[in-house]
Amino acid sequence: MTWRIDYSRDSLEFINKHKLQNKVREELRKFLVVINRGQAPINLKKLEGKWTGYYRLRKGKIRIIFYINKLEKALYIERVDFRGNVYK
C-alpha cells in the first residue's frame, strides 16, 4: 500500500508561491523511504505544545509541519513555511 499525502490550503499556497513543489515532494519521498525501512530520519523532530502530535522536517530554511496517520498510511501537511514563520 502506498502512502497518501494531503496538503492544507495554506501549505499549497506557500509551495506554489515559492515554486517549491519538487523540493517538498522530494523531501517527503525521502522521509517515507527512511521510515519504511524502520529508521528515524535525522531531520525529523516531534513537536510539542500547540503542535503536539505533529512532526517537523527541515529542508534548508524551509520547515514542513505534518501529521502522520499510520493506520491509513497518510501524511497531512499542515504548514510549509520559512523557519521564522512556520510556528506562528
Placement of each model-derived feature along the sequence:
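Arg/Lys-rich, positively charged N-terminal/basic patches that mediate binding to nucleic acids
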Residues: 1-31
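Short coil/turn residues that cap or connect secondary-structure elements
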Residues: 19, 23, 36-39, 51, ...
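A short, surface-exposed loop/turn module that caps and links secondary-structure elements
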Residues: 33-56
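Conserved short hydrophobic interaction patches
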Residues: 31-34, 83
